């Protein structure tokens, strides 16, 4: 099977309705991967910061916006929330990078993903979170399978 390749950057999301491989590289950012096995459709977001503070544009740069928009985009192509499962990746803290208020940005990004997915009743079936190393992930859209490779600090 031939897969279309799609790379997403921070503040982006993508839902694949055709067989695709969606890729991104993460440091303290988090990616939420959603999969609907009935529709065989997947989507991924990549967010930089946990919460939009209602100042400026409500961008998918923020976890609370990015996760909601990803769920909405999946529903827009026919997926049902009750059929979605999630996989979470990222949230690293290389050398305590980006400490705010005593908590690292990566940790806050992880917390918001858990909170929103729990609130939306979307089960988290796999995760690789935290630590000090970045990650490159590749999501096969029609199977929901995620391949993960740890990367060196210089790669993200």
Swiss-Prot record:
EC number, UniProt record: 3.5.1.44
GO molecular function, one term: protein-glutamine glutaminase activity
Cysteine-cysteine disulfides: none
Catalytic activity: L-glutaminyl-[protein] + H2O = L-glutamyl-[protein] + NH4(+)
Biological process annotations from GO: chemotaxis
Sorted UniProt keywords: Chemotaxis, Hydrolase
Gene3D superfamilies recorded: 3.30.1330.200
Domain of life: Bacteria
Keyword check for Ribonucleoprotein: no
Transmembrane segments: none
CDD domains in alphabetical order: CheD
Role of this protein: Probably deamidates glutamine residues to glutamate on methyl-accepting chemotaxis receptors (MCPs), playing an important role in chemotaxis.
Entry's family note: Belongs to the CheD family.
HAMAP family for this protein: CheD (MF_01440)
Name this protein carries in UniProt: Probable chemoreceptor glutamine deamidase CheD
Organism annotation: Sulfurimonas denitrificans (strain ATCC 33889 / DSM 1251) (Thiomicrospira denitrificans (strain ATCC 33889 / DSM 1251))
Lineage: Bacteria, Pseudomonadati, Campylobacterota, Epsilonproteobacteria, Campylobacterales
